[in-house]
């Protein structure tokens, strides 16, 4: 189905919720559904790998100390909690190592928001007081609803602008996305879906200062999963949320989160439903090949090109001959990741959000994966020597749509020679990562934490999910100790 532009009354909130309720599997193109399955597989891979890193285990212990036992499963653990606690843990696991998906125009990590909400909602349906089975196809349709909602809400707020101003955009855009997806899976009416979205939106937030010293950045997308799930569970029993939350000029979601952005118009509510059902944001969700913030992937690839083109100059034992490195970034990426480190060593989160560290790690280790954020790397003399020589700057050449994750690298050497390279759009954005490459990434990550038989069973289950009568079969495979 498709929808028209917003009504004269300007109620794009109702239009979105009507579309959510009425969307049928046959409305979704086959390639979109196929991509959704691969994004699900990628999210599960990230959750499995992230479930037992130190900060995830600390979160799991803290929640286990105070949460009673429930019926919702947790990735990588033999424990069950209530739906909100399970959503918090699963979301924090998927975001734990910065390998999960991202949307480059309206920045959010969709899997870490949607999978936790939908896993819990499915188990509420199948194991709660009103028992009913959720099919794999029903799950996938709800997942597509979330994939479509988050980026559209973000576009109504000028996408990455929120990130430039210090908000953690993903938990903001992600809260209504999780509500819409959960509402679809729970079978809510348009009116109740609108309540769920309103309840989620009034809880939304997230501060980007979380990227420096703490661990809490890992859990902020999980807050959005919880917000949306909670909104849908309340609305399912008739609890009324904010209506017209995207349309209200006083205290509305778009109005408040765009305060002070200096834009005209301040926000664009029509973007919430523009081309809904015609153009599919699911296929615009990007899959990561590097274990760091998506905005720095262009920088990594520019450095990779320099390393290939000038192997003698960039040999590890010759890096001391570098005099200066200048990294040019888009406005939102510079604001987010171009900061100068204030202390050594950085935390793992700080390293994954810092362009100078990311570039230095690429030069020293030839890759930016999980090992580059272990303590030995975070305090490496070779890395810090290059960090001290790195300056990040804003360049408007990357501010145009579609180029926010690009970068230009200029390297000056002690002998006076200068080399440079530029990547306008990193791989994963243009060209996008293929489904074959996602499966390859899944196998590489999953094989590090589970045996080959379990890996294959999960892969088979996900890639044939539309034929499954009960999604709980998949949930049983991904829960349980690793």
Curated annotation (Swiss-Prot):
The keyword Transmembrane does not apply. Its EC number is 4.1.1.-. One of its GO terms (molecular function) is lyase activity. It holds the Pfam family MmgE_PrpD_C. Keywords: Lyase. Coiled coil: none annotated. Belongs to the PrpD family. Cis-aconitate decarboxylase-like protein; part of the gene cluster that mediates the biosynthesis of oryzines, natural products with an unusual maleidride backbone. The two subunits of the fungal fatty acid synthase oryfasA and oryfasB probably form octenoic acid. This fatty acid is most likely activated by the acyl-CoA ligase oryP to give octenyl-CoA before the citrate synthase-like protein oryE catalyzes condensation with oxaloacetate to form tricarboxylic acid. This is Cis-aconitate decarboxylase-like protein oryM. It comes from Aspergillus oryzae (strain ATCC 42149 / RIB 40) (Yellow koji mold).
């Amino acid at each position: 189905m498709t929808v028209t532009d917003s009504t004269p009354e300007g109620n794009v909130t109702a239009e979105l919720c009507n579309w959510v309720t009425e969307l049928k599997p046959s409305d979704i193109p086959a390639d979109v559904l196929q991509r959704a399955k691969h994004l699900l597989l990628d999210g599960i891979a990230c959750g499995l790998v992230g479930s037992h890193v130190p900060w995830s285990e600390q979160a799991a212990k803290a929640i286990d100390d105070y949460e009673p036992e429930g019926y919702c499963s947790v990735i990588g653990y033999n424990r069950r909690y209530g739906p909100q606690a399970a959503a918090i843990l699963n979301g924090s696991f998927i975001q734990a190592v910065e390998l999960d998906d991202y949307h480059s125009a309206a920045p959010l990590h969709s899997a870490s928001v949607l999978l936790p909400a939908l896993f819990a909602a499915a188990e509420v349906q199948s194991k709660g007081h009103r028992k009913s089975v959720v099919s794999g196809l029903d799950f996938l349709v709800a997942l597509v609803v979330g994939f479509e909602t988050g980026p559209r809400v973000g576009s109504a707020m000028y996408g990455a602008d929120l990130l430039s101003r210090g908000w953690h955009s993903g938990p903001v855009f992600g809260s209504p996305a999780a509500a819409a997806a959960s509402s679809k899976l729970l079978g809510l009416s348009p009116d109740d879906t609108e309540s769920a979205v309103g309840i989620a939106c009034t809880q939304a937030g997230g501060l980007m200062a979380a990227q420096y010293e703490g661990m809490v950045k890992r859990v902020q997308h999980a807050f959005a999963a919880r917000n949306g799930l909670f909104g849908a569970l309340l609305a399912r029993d008739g609890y009324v949320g904010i209506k017209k939350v995207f349309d209200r000029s006083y205290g509305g979601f778009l109005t408040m989160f765009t305060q002070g952005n200096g834009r005209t118009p301040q926000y664009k509510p029509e973007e919430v439903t523009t081309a809904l059902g015609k153009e599919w944001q699911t296929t615009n969700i990007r899959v990561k090949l590097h274990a760091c913030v998506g905005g720095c992937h262009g920088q990594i690839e520019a450095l990779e090109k320099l390393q290939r083109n000038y192997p003698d100059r960039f040999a590890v034992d010759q890096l001391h001959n570098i005099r200066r490195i200048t990294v040019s970034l888009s406005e939102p990426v510079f604001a987010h990741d171009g900061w100068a480190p204030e202390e050594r060593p950085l935390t793992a989160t700080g390293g994954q959000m810092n362009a100078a560290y990311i570039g230095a790690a690429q030069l020293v280790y030839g890759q930016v994966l999980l090992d580059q954020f272990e303590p030995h790397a975070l305090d490496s003399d070779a890395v810090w020597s290059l960090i001290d020589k790195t300056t990040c700057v804003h360049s408007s050449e990357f501010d145009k749509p579609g180029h926010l994750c690009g970068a230009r690298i200029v390297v000056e050497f002690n002998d006076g020679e200068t080399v440079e390279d530029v990547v306008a759009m990193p791989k994963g954005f243009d060209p996008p990562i293929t489904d074959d490459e996602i499966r390859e990434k899944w196998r590489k990550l999953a094989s590090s934490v589970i045996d080959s038989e379990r890996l294959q069973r999960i892969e088979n289950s996900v890639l044939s999910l539309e034929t499954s009568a009960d999604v709980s079969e998949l949930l049983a495979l991904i829960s349980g100790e690793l």
